[in-house]
Amino acid sequence: MAEYNFDLFIIGAGSGGVRAARLASKLGKKVAIAEEYRFGGTCVIRGCVPKKLMVYASSYSKIFKEGQGYGWDQKDAVFSWNKFSKSMNLEIDRLEDIYHDLLTSSNV
């Protein structure tokens, strides 16, 4: 059986876990972090970030309608869930990569 020896073992690679890991590593501690799914935690992967992107995307319909009063002509303002979902997932992937890079550069 493998043996592991860490000064700090963190469960969860969300914002708090990543910050704790980076700070401990900066203090010279040997740190490991475990994550069930993806780096970034609930906020980045399933909660805050996707929700904010959805709310932001939903505001465009009203903006397009209001723009007509200012000379803008948008005839085919059609929402595509597939295009939006792809863009949203690319942004989540980008943020996850940042978390991963922060941990790697901190020797975690």
What are these regions (language model features)?
Residues 2-16:
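Beta1/beta-strand and adjacent pyrophosphate-binding region of the FAD-binding site
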Residues 3-6, 22-29, 34-108:
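Glycine-rich flavin
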